[in-house]
Curated annotation (Swiss-Prot):
SMART domains: HOX. Residues 151-280 are annotated as: Interaction with PIT-1. Transmembrane segments: none annotated. A motif (Nuclear localization signal) lies at residues 287-291. It comes from Mus musculus. Interacts with POU1F1. The gene is Pitx1. Residues 1-104 are annotated as: Disordered. Residues 69-81 have a biased composition (Gly residues). Sequence-specific transcription factor that binds gene promoters and activates their transcription. May play a role in the development of anterior structures, and in particular, the brain and facies and in specifying the identity or structure of hindlimb. Can independently activate and synergize with PIT-1 on pituitary-specific target gene promoters, thus may subserve functions in generating both precursor and specific cell phenotypes in the anterior pituitary gland and in several other organs. Can activate pituitary transcription of the proopiomelanocortin gene. This is Pituitary homeobox 1.
Length: 315
């Protein structure tokens, strides 16, 4: 009765509020499977169709791409096979020359370093070579020759400059004898730059007092003095009448009196010929100052009646 009452109460409910009837037990799984299968069938079919439709395309694409890939691979292999052949063709083989060929080529190179086409062809005939080989050999040989010339010039510039400079300085020390005491200070003042004008400032800036103190030194005049026992006749090449005229000596006559014929200790010619005018002017100023300063020991130059030679002045 309760169930009947419950069923009647459910029937009295409106349709919107009624619960769905329970499905039967035997139809439940099949119903669920049918409902689950109904919407899935078109999806599976579509998926299968799409997969079936796509697979041939992919296979076809794979099959189509396979030959292309294979063709590309084969082309790559063919290119790889062709590249060494091209490299071998482009790369020239090293030519091995015989001694006879080298002798002929060297002899021709000594005569002419730039042979023309006809001469290269003749050389190729003589040496049993091709003209391009002969041309390349001459090109390489010229490059080697120029490199050797440059290296030789660099060696000469590096190692030959000091000997050349010393060669300019060294002869001035070897020309003079060791007995000349004035060579010491002269060589020291002239050795750095014998031909430059900077060395002349030593004489140009020399005052009369400094020149007097220099020439009054025993080392500079003692070598030029002569013994008092040697008379006028003992001087070779100087007559007695010439000795009487030495009273009127000037700077120029003093220079002529100191020639090798009049004085056994003649002044060397080459290096000091440049300084003679400067020395003469300094000697003239020395004579003028010696008259005022008699304490410097130049008594022989004070009086005009002095009959001594230029080499006989005593300090």
């Amino acid at each position: 009765m309760d169930a009947f009452k419950g069923g009647m109460s459910l029937e009295r409910l409106p349709e919107g509020l009624r619960p769905p009837p329970p499905p039967p037990h035997d139809m439940g799984p099949s119903f669920h499977l049918a409902r689950a299968a109904d919407p899935r069938e078109p999806l599976e079919n579509s998926a299968s169709e799409s997969s079936d439709a796509d697979l041939p395309d992919k296979e076809r694409g794979g099959e189509a791409k396979g030959p292309e890939d294979g063709g590309a691979g084969s082309a790559g292999c063919g290119g790889g096979a062709e590249d060494p052949a091209k490299k071998k063709k482009q790369r020239r083989q090293r030519t091995h020359f015989t001694s006879q060929q080298l002798q002929e080529l060297e002899a021709t190179f000594q005569r002419n370093r730039y042979p023309d086409m006809s001469m290269r062809e003749e050389i190729a005939v003589w040496t049993n070579l091709t003209e391009p080989r002969v041309r390349v050999w001459f090109k390489n040989r010229r490059a080697k020759w120029r490199k050797r010339e440059r290296n030789q010039q660099l060696d000469l510039c590096k190692g030959g400059y000091v000997p050349q400079f010393s060669g300019l300085v060294q002869p001035y020390e070897d020309v003079y004898a060791a007995g000349y005491s004035y060579n010491n200070w002269a060589a020291k003042s002239l050795a750095p730059a014998p031909l430059s004008t900077k060395s002349f400032t030593f004489f140009n800036s020399m005052s009369p007092l400094s020149s007097q103190s220099m020439f009054s030194a025993p080392s500079s005049i003692s070598s030029m003095t002569m013994p008092s026992s040697m008379g006028p006749g003992a001087v070779p090449g100087m007559p007695n009448s010439g000795l009487n005229n030495i009273n009127n000596l000037t700077g120029s006559s003093l220079n002529s009196a100191m020639s090798p014929g009049a004085c056994p200790y003649g002044t060397p010619a080459s290096p000091y010929s440049v300084y003679r005018d400067t020395c003469n002017s300094s000697l003239a100023s020395l004579r003028l100052k010696s008259k005022q300063h008699s304490s410097f020991g130049y008594g022989g130059l004070q009086g005009p009646a002095s009959g001594l030679n230029a080499c006989q002045y005593n300090s």
